[in-house]
C-alpha cells in the first residue's frame, strides 16, 4: 500500500504498475508545502488505520526529515539509508552502508513497527501491469508550524572569480 499527500492530480493509480495495490490519498491544502511534523502525523494516522507494520521512505531530503519524526511518534525502529530491501527470512534485517561506504552493517529491527529509508538505486524497479485502487483517506491535519510566504528561485550563475568555494577534480597528468 502507498500514501499520497496533498492535492495530487497526476494518475497515481498508475503506481499499480510497480506493485502498489492500494493508495491512500490525503487531500488537504495544509499539505501543499512540506512540514515534516504535519506529514509524519498524517502518515502515522494512515499507517495505524491500515495496520502497516513496515513504512518505507526514499532516503531523500523529505524522507530524512519525516522518517525520524514518524519513528518517534509510532515508537518504531528506524534504519535510514538502507541499501537493500529487508531480509525477513529470520526476523527483520536491513543492510546499511557504513563508514562512508567502505563497509556494510546488517541491522536487526525488533519493534512491532519498522521504518526504513532506502538509498537511491537500492533496488531496481520494473514496470509491470496493473493499476492501484485509490482510496480517499480522511486524516486530522494540523496547521503547519511554518508558513511559506514566497519562493524565490536563484537565477544566473556565480562567476568563477567570485565563488567562495571552488571544487576541482581530475586525474592529473603522469608527467610534465
Protein language model features and the residues they cover:
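N-terminal glycine-rich FAD/FM-binding segment characteristic of electron-transfer flavoproteins
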Residues: 1-176
Amino acid at each position: 500500500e502507498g500514501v499520497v499527500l496533498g492535492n495530487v492530480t497526476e494518475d497515481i493509480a498508475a503506481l499499480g504498475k510497480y506493485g502498489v495495490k492500494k493508495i491512500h490519498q490525503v487531500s488537504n491544502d495544509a499539505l501543499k508545502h512540506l512540514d515534516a511534523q504535519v506529514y509524519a502525523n498524517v502518515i502515522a494516522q494512515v499507517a495505524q488505520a491500515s495496520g502497516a507494520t513496515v513504512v518505507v521512505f526514499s532516503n531523500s531530503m523529505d524522507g530524512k526529515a519525516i522518517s525520524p519524526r514518524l519513528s518517534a511518534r509510532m515508537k518504531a525502529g528506524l534504519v535510514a539509508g538502507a541499501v537493500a530491501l529487508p531480509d525477513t527470512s529470520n526476523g527483520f534485517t536491513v543492510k546499511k552502508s557504513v563508514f562512508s561506504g567502505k563497509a556494510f552493517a546488517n541491522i536487526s529491527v525488533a519493534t512491532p513497527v519498522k521504518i526504513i529509508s532506502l538509498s537511491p538505486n537500492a533496488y531496481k524497479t520494473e514496470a509491470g501491469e496493473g493499476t492501484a485502487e485509490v482510496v480517499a483517506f480522511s486524516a486530522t491535519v494540523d496547521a503547519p508550524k511554518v508558513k511559506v510566504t514566497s519562493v524565490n528561485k536563484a537565477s544566473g550563475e556565480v562567476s568563477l572569480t567570485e565563488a567562495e568555494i571552488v571544487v576541482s577534480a581530475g586525474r592529473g597528468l603522469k608527467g610534465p
